[in-house]
Amino acid sequence: MARIKGGLATHKRHKKVLALTKGHASTRHSLFKRAHESMVHAMSYAFAHRRARKGDMRRLWITRINAAARAEGLTYGELISGLKVAGIDINRKVLADMAISDTVAFAAVAAKAAAAKAN
């Protein structure tokens, strides 16, 4: 039986790796061995950072809410505590969006939270 070297499959795999590393620096986009290492690391970072993005976005929302709350005379913690006491169930993503795009509505929500906190 003749030996099969698998040249076509290898060539396709190499082309795929080199296509994925297009834009990488130096030999990381042209030499297969270096490109493969670069691709594995890049994919690993992409996987980890897709998960890290969730926390990053939450931190951004909290920062925005805190800034808007301070403009209304409350701290972030006081606002969130007041919302819980008032029974207003709005998540941080919506609150942050409201703080940027609809400041009047955010001010009304902050006023209700402050009133609930005062009682």
Swiss-Prot record:
| Keyword match RNA-binding | yes
In terms of domain of life, where is this protein from? Bacteria
Any one Gene Ontology molecular-function term assigned to this protein's record? rRNA binding
Q: Which SUPFAM superfamilies match?
A: Ribosomal protein L20
The protein's UniProt keywords, in alphabetical order, are: Ribonucleoprotein, Ribosomal protein, RNA-binding, rRNA-binding
| One Gene Ontology biological process | ribosomal large subunit assembly
What protein family does this chain belong to?
Belongs to the bacterial ribosomal protein bL20 family.
Q: What does this protein do?
A: Binds directly to 23S ribosomal RNA and is necessary for the in vitro assembly process of the 50S ribosomal subunit. It is not involved in the protein synthesizing functions of that subunit.
* Name under which the protein is recorded: Large ribosomal subunit protein bL20
Which gene holds the coding sequence for this protein? rplT
